Each structure stands twice: as structure tokens, then as C-alpha cells.
Curated annotation (Swiss-Prot):
It comes from Ralstonia pickettii (strain 12J). PANTHER family: 54S RIBOSOMAL PROTEIN L1, MITOCHONDRIAL, LARGE RIBOSOMAL SUBUNIT PROTEIN UL1M. Keywords: Repressor, Ribonucleoprotein, Ribosomal protein, RNA-binding, rRNA-binding, Translation regulation, tRNA-binding. GO terms for cellular component: cytosolic large ribosomal subunit. This is Large ribosomal subunit protein uL1. The lineage of its organism: Bacteria, Pseudomonadati, Pseudomonadota, Betaproteobacteria, Burkholderiales. Part of the 50S ribosomal subunit. The keyword RNA-binding applies.
């Protein structure tokens, strides 16, 4: 059995595993327990009332967090002509077509997000086995395949996060950093939960947002009392 560090043990002792904390207290605890030497990310896990095995209940989408993610994002765009110029003007670091595809095939992937204009999918489609496993394959469901590449670039730069339910019916997402003010983390969490609610499958029955828990990169998970989320 792995040995728990003194810091991890001390943090674990601060949190009651079965207790549901008011959101303000939950975020305060998470920030307090985020004692690593780097600016830890603040993450959320949301248990959804869906059957992830059913194709019509796969929850997937994206949302621009109002307070951003605290991360600098490098964007690559597949576009040509006017759309290529629009992508560059919007701040994309890399814009190309076959040349960009060759870079990717050669393992040169110095970017965090890939956006594609629909007319470039003949090129992008050949990269599925490379980009797919890395979570980088452009997809219209999350707004990364779009004719409006400029807006997509701006959204990515502004703090857009993508979400997709896992096999256990849980959504995992980052809502900021330890250095964020609690109000910023709350606004980001509210935006994410609103996006999840809007993405609720029509076939999902019963309670949809079942459990919400927040944590930091190296810290413990803290369950949230959902009744306090609207406060």
C-alpha cells in the first residue's frame, strides 16, 4: 500500500468524506488543501443521472468560463484563404492545411486546441488516429469544427473548456486555479453546471445533477451541498 505523505494525511483529516459542504466552505477547504509549490488547478466532478452506455445519453459540449481557466492556450487552425487570415487575426498560433497535417504526423504538436473549418475535414480526417487519443480531434459538438474559426479561436483563448461524460456517468472539468478568488471559481462552476443542464439528454429521467465535488490537483475531494450553488 502506498505511503501517504504528512501533508496529504493532514489535508485528508480536514475533510469529512461523507459531509456535503456549502459551496463557499468547500472552495475554501480545497484552496487551503492545495499546498503544492505550483498553482494547482481546481477541478470539479459532476455525477450525472444518465446511462453513459446509451448513445442517446452521451453528454458532450463546451462552455466559455467567465473567469477563464488561468491557462495560456495555444491554438492550431486548419483553414485556407480568408478564413486562415481571420484565424491569424483572432490570435491563432498555427494556421495551415497540408503543411500543418504533415507537422502533426511528424509529432510536432505544440498546441492545446485544434480548430477546423468544415471544408478542411478532408485533410483533418486523416489525423484521427493521432489527434483522437489526445482529445484534440476537432468536433462540431464542442464548437471546434465551425465556419466561424475566428470566434472559435477567441473562445479557446478566453477560457473555453470541453466536457464529455465518462463511462461512469461523470463529467470532469477544470474551473480555475488555486490563485483564483472564490467568486471567480463560483462563477466558472455556475457556467459549467448551466451548460451541463442545457445538454441534458431528453431520455434522461430522474435527478440529473446527482453529485458535485471539487478538488485540487494534489488535494482531496470535497462534496458540495447543491442547495448552496444558487446562493
Amino acid at each position: 500500500m502506498a505511503k501517504i505523505s504528512k501533508r496529504a494525511a493532514a489535508n485528508k483529516a480536514k475533510v469529512e468524506r461523507t459531509k456535503f459542504y456549502p459551496i463557499d466552505e468547500a472552495l475554501s477547504l480545497v484552496k487551503e488543501c492545495a499546498s503544492a509549490k505550483f498553482d494547482e488547478s481546481i477541478d470539479v466532478a459532476v455525477q450525472l443521472g444518465i446511462d453513459a452506455k446509451k448513445s442517446d445519453q452521451v453528454v458532450r459540449g463546451s462552455v466559455v468560463l467567465p473567469a477563464g481557466t488561468g491557462k495560456s492556450v495555444r491554438v492550431a487552425v486548419f483553414a485556407q484563404g480568408d478564413k486562415a487570415e481571420q484565424a491569424k487575426a483572432a490570435g491563432a498560433e498555427i494556421v495551415g492545411m497540408e503543411d500543418l497535417a504533415e507537422q502533426i504526423k511528424a509529432g510536432k504538436m505544440d498546441f492545446d486546441v485544434v480548430i477546423a473549418s468544415p471544408d478542411t475535414m478532408r485533410v483533418v480526417g486523416t489525423l484521427g488516429q493521432i489527434l483522437g487519443p489526445r482529445g484534440l480531434m476537432p468536433n462540431p459538438k464542442v464548437g471546434t469544427v465551425t465556419p466561424d474559426v475566428a470566434t472559435a479561436v477567441k473562445n479557446a483563448k478566453a477560457g473555453q473548456v470541453q466536457f464529455r461524460v465518462d463511462k461512469a456517468g461523470i463529467i470532469h472539468a477544470t474551473i480555475g486555479r488555486r490563485s483564483f478568488e472564490p467568486a471567480a471559481l463560483k462563477s466558472n462552476l455556475a457556467a459549467l453546471l448551466d451548460a451541463l443542464t442545457k445538454a441534458k439528454p431528453a431520455s434522461s429521467k430522474g435527478v440529473y445533477l446527482r453529485k458535485v465535488a471539487v478538488s485540487s490537483t494534489m488535494g482531496v475531494g470535497v462534496r458540495v451541498d447543491q442547495a448552496t450553488l444558487a446562493a
